[in-house]
Regions:
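SDR active-site strand-loop-helix element
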Residues: 17, 41, 81-85, 123-128, ...
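Rossmann-fold cofactor-recognition segment
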Residues: 55-64
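Alpha-helical substrate-binding/gating segment
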Residues: 182-185, 203-222
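NAD(P)H-binding glycine-rich loop region in Rossmannoid oxidoreductase-like domains
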Residues: 63-103
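Catalytic helix-loop patch of NAD(P)-dependent Rossmann-fold dehydrogenases
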Residues: 95-113, 117, 121-122, 131-176, ...
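Conserved glycine-rich Rossmann-like NAD(P)H-binding loop of the short-chain dehydrogenase/reductase
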Residues: 36-45
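N-terminal Rossmann NAD(P)H-binding glycine-rich loop of SDR-like oxidoreductase domains
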Residues: 15-34
Length: 222
């Protein structure tokens, strides 16, 4: 889901939230390889400092800290945001929904407000296919109804709604990426899926094939 998001045709300073995590660290490398200038902010709850290249500015902190984010914008001249920070485990979101509404929804609201205040106009949001819930059609399309069935999906969908509404009234454009099963690693071995106990399907299947876990849990019949 995108709202008038232009291609980055010139080198830009891009703030990558969660840039020490799995997807975020790959985005940092992709930005560098494309000639852009990434800046990372990560609280290192699940990310790793070693995943951030030495030549990339790194701030350890929470995106809900408006003063920190404003300082990053000022010091680095940030022009765009790629927002990967958040919590992603579906069963945990059911057991602890408030954690997800804080980390994924409330913190995203703070980041969006900081961006609007600073005049940062370009925002790419790491959403999730969980916003679709149990879709009645396959393959799923971008305009398939979004009816999440767990707090994780809903916490991400609410952020999409915030971005939509902000873009309608401010000089602000965004794109929301709704992943299904993320897999893979940097071909040069610079980063990869390193989180202990990760729940990504492909990693779980590979670990089962290698004998590192006893089974792969299958949910649903498709």
């Amino acid at each position: 889901a995108c709202a008038t998001h232009p291609p980055m045709t010139k080198s830009r300073k891009v703030l990558v939230t969660g840039g020490a995590g799995y997807i975020g660290s790959h985005a940092v490398l992709a930005l560098k390889d494309a000639g852009h200038l990434p800046v990372v902010v990560d609280i290192l709850t699940t990310g790793f400092g070693w995943a951030v290249p030495d030549d990339v500015p790194f701030y350890e902190g929470d995106i809900s800290d408006g003063d920190l984010v404003a300082r990053i914008f000022h010091e680095q001249g940030v022009e765009a945001i790629m927002h990967f920070a958040g919590s992603i485990i579906v069963p945990e979101s059911v057991e602890n929904p408030l954690k997800y509404y804080r980390n994924n929804t409330a913190n995203s609201r703070s980041l969006i407000e900081s961006a609007v205040t600073a005049g940062v106009k370009h925002f790419i949001f790491s959403s999730t296919a969980a916003t679709y819930g149990l879709p009645e059609e396959s393959p799923v399309r971008e305009d398939t109804p979004q009816i999440p069935i767990n707090p994780y999906g809903l916490s991400k969908l609410m952020t999409e709604y915030m971005l939509r509404d902000v873009a309608a009234v401010h000089d602000f454009n965004y794109c929301a990426l709704r992943y299904f099963n993320v897999a893979g690693a940097d071909p040069q071995g610079r980063t990869g899926q390193s989180t202990a106990g990760a729940t990504h399907l492909i990693k779980v299947a590979v670990e089962a094939a290698l004998g590192k876990r006893g089974h792969v849990g299958v949910f649903g019949t498709d």
